[in-house]
């Protein structure tokens, strides 16, 4: 007596494998597109905030956050006008007495940055975007105007913008496209994170970028 044997033919198996391959390829392509979009957003943050910073200086002859004329102009909290944006990029919770928080309020009131309030914005990966003076709260005359070599936080002197919690691939691509791809030199520098939104170390030292798939970095750029 003959029995019917049920199973998949080689053609059917081949079709299934092709479909699986197409699905996996689409997923990987989609993931790469998402990564590229994040890189573009991070670069846009750096370039946009830099343009807003210099535009504010040109218009008001003062640093946002440090502007001693902000109250007369908008009713905002004044800075002390000493030429230094006091505080750290990851100040939290933000208060108007912190110049690194008033920085955002001044830029928003002036129309150079969208939104309202004093809180730092978040980047494309939900890390903090903030500013601080690389050399710390040093009188302007004492700040050495150098880009390379040993400096203040992040290896910089002067106002810098930092963006935290960046996946290694995003951080490396951002530094490569904007600067020299070297973590410890140039106008963009990175710090390997061990915690979210970390404090920026005194100098950008240590090993090179490492794309492990798990590393995260805080990138800072001299404005």
Residue locations for each model-derived region?
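N-terminal single-pass transmembrane signal-anchor helix
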Residues: 2-39, 45
């Amino acid at each position: 007596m003959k029995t019917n044997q049920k199973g998949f033919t080689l053609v059917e198996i081949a079709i299934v494998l092709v479909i699986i391959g197409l699905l996996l390829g689409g997923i990987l392509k989609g993931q790469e597109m998402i990564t590229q979009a994040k890189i573009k957003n991070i670069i846009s943050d750096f370039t946009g905030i830099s343009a807003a910073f210099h535009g504010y200086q040109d218009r008001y002859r003062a640093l946002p956050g440090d502007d001693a004329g902000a109250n007369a102009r908008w009713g905002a909290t004044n800075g002390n006008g000493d030429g230094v944006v006091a505080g750290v990029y990851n100040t939290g919770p933000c208060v108007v007495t912190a110049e690194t928080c008033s920085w955002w309020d001044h830029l928003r009131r002036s129309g150079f940055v969208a939104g309202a309030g004093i809180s730092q914005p978040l980047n494309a990966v939900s890390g903090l975007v903030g500013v601080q003076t690389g050399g710390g709260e040093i009188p302007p005359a004492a700040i050495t105007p150098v880009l390379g070599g040993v400096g203040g936080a992040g290896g910089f002197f002067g106002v810098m913008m930092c963006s935290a919690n960046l996946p290694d691939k995003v951080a490396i691509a951002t530094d490569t496209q904007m600067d020299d791809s070297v973590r410890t030199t140039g106008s963009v520098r990175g710090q390997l994170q061990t915690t979210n939104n970390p404090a920026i170390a005194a100098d950008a030292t240590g090993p090179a970028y490492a794309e492990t798939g798990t590393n995260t970095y805080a990138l800072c750029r001299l404005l």
